[in-house]
Amino acid sequence: MSAARPQFSIDDAFELSLEDGGPGPESSGVARFGPLHFERRARFEVADEDKQSRLRYQNLENDEDGAQASPEPDGGVGTRDSSRTSIRSSQWSFSTISSSTQRSYNTCCSWTQHPLIQKNRRVVLASFLLLLLGLVLILVGVGLEATPSPGVSSAIFFVPGFLLLVPGVYHVIFIYCAVKGHRGFQFFYLPYFEK
């Protein structure tokens, strides 16, 4: 009754007994799998692959016609190898618009042309409305503090002003960063945005 049990080790978890079924027992009657192997890659390889996958995801999520986002921080055109040429490369070669004009338009107003912004125009306008109403109410409260009026408290304007300003600023910044493809900002995280 006091039979000594062998100690359980991590290798025992990878043994397949005859009852478990499987590919078939080895000569010892118990099928064994090979040791666990975890592949470690160099940090720069992972970072480069992560950057490429982010660019691909950004293209799928944030670009209507599949144009590749520029990896250059100043908005310049990056160099690409021939295996990654864009569909739009032929369109760019025939373009009569100068690159500086195109770049200035892209940095200024391109986020308003995003397909998800067009589709959710009401939500974007509501975010801007919250922002503007909050600012107006706070400015009225500041004006009442500067020139007090009997019977009217500035707190009546400050409290609703901050209650409207905070979500307005949050949503406007979040929408802008999601369109620009900043890491951590995606339309998926805004539940009232139709995808």
From Swiss-Prot:
It is found in: Membrane; Cytoplasm, Perinuclear region. Its main location: membrane. Keywords: Cytoplasm, Host-virus interaction, Membrane, Phosphoprotein, Transmembrane, Transmembrane helix. The chain crosses the membrane at residues 123-143, 155-175. Residues 144-154 are extracellular. One of its GO terms (cellular component) is membrane. The keyword Transmembrane helix applies. The modification Phosphoserine is found at residue 93. It is a multi-pass membrane protein. It holds the Pfam family TMEM_230_134. Residues 1-122, 176-195 are cytoplasmic. InterPro entries: TMEM134 (IPR039714), TMEM_230/134 (IPR008590). PANTHER family: TRANSMEMBRANE PROTEIN 134 (PTHR13558:SF1). This is Transmembrane protein 134. It comes from Homo sapiens (Human). The gene is TMEM134.
